[in-house]
C-alpha cells in the first residue's frame, strides 16, 4: 500500500519547483523595475547633454566635474554598500534609495545653481551607490541558480535597459512635444523630463516597500549575520586572483559604457539636431534588453567568459570605427556604429557580473566582494568625465572625440587581455579538477 507514495511526492515536487521558479523570477522582475527606474535621472546627459549645458549654463568641464564628483561618491560608497547588503534588509535600502533619488530630482527640476547641482549629485551618489547598488546585485546572485547566473544578470541589465528605454521614449516624446509642438523653451522641456523620472522613482519605491522578502532569503540573511567577520572576509577575498581579474574586466568594460554617454553630443557635433541625436541615442537604449538578455542567454548556452571576450573585441573595433568613419562622410554608417556599440556594451554589462560566479566566493560575503570589485571597477566614474570634458573643451569637434575614443579603444584591448587570462585560469582549474 506504500507504493503510491513516490508518485504523490513527484506531483508535490513539481508544483513546488514551479512555485520556487515563479517566485525567483518575480523577485528578479521587481529588481529590474527598481534598477531601471533609479539610474536614468542621474545620466540624462547621454540624451540631453547639449540641452543640460544650455539650461544650467555650465561648460563641458563643469559638467565633467559634477560627474567626477558623483563617481567619487560612488567610489567611497561601494565597499560600505557591500557591507550594508550583507547586514540590512535589502527592500528598505531600495525603498530609501528610490524615494531619495526622486525627491532630489524634484529639486533638480528647479534649475539650481552650480552649488545646488553639486549637492544634488553628491546626494545622488549616496542614494544610488551606498544604499542601492550591492543590495540589488547580491539579491540577484542569491535567487539565481548556478546555471542561471548569466541569464539572471543578463535579464537584470537587459530588463532595466528595457525600463530605461521605455522611460526614455516617453521622456523624449514629452521633450519634443514641449519644445517643437508647443514652442516652449528647452528648459521647460527638460523640466518635464525630470518630473517624469522623479515621480516614477518615488512611486516604485512606495510599491516595493510594501512587499516582503521571501522566507528563504530572510533565513539566509540570518545565517550570514552570525558568520560575518569583516577583516577575515576581506583577507579571504584579497587572496582570490580571479576576483582581481573580474575587477580588471569590469574596470575596462565600464570604460566602454562611459563612452556611450557622449554619443548625443558627438552626433550633434556631426550636424544632427537635438531631437534627432536624442532619437538615435534612445534607439541605442533599446539595444540594452537585446544585448543584456541576449548576451546572458548566449553566456549560459556557451560560456559567459567566451561571449564576453567576443563582445569586448567587437566593441573595441567599433570604437576605432568612430574615429575612421566620419572621414568617409557616411552618416548612416556612423549611426549604425553607435547603435552597435550600444548593443555590445550592454552585452558586456550583462555578463561581467555573471563571471563573478567563477570565483567561487562564499555567498555570505558576496556583497563584500561586489563592493571590492565596484570600488576599482567603477573607478572610471571619477576620472573619465574629466578626461572627456578636458579633451572636448581643449580640442573642440572631431579631434577631441578622436582622442577620447582612441583612449577608450586602448582600454578595450586591456580588458580583452584580462578576460583571456581569466578564461585560461578557469580552464586550467577545470582541467586540474578532472584529474587529467
Regions found by a protein language model. Name each.
Residues 303-355:
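C-terminal transmembrane helical hairpin of 12-TM major facilitator-type secondary transporters
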Residues 76-114:
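Conserved MFS/SLC helix-loop-helix module at the cytosolic interface between two early adjacent transmembrane helices
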Residues 77-89, 291-304, 392-393:
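Helix-to-loop junctions at the C-terminal end of transmembrane segments
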Residues 45-49, 168, 240-292, 384-385:
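Extracytoplasmic gate region of multi-pass secondary transporters
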Residues 176, 198-221, 418-423:
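C-terminal membrane-cytosol helix-exit motif in multi-pass small-molecule transporters
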Residues 87-98, 300-313:
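Cytoplasmic membrane-interface "Motif A"-like loop-to-helix N-cap segments
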Residues 150-176, 374-385:
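Glycine-rich segments within core transmembrane alpha-helices of 12-TM secondary carriers
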Residues 5-6, 212-232, 429-435:
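Flexible cytoplasmic inter-helical loops of multi-pass small-molecule transporters
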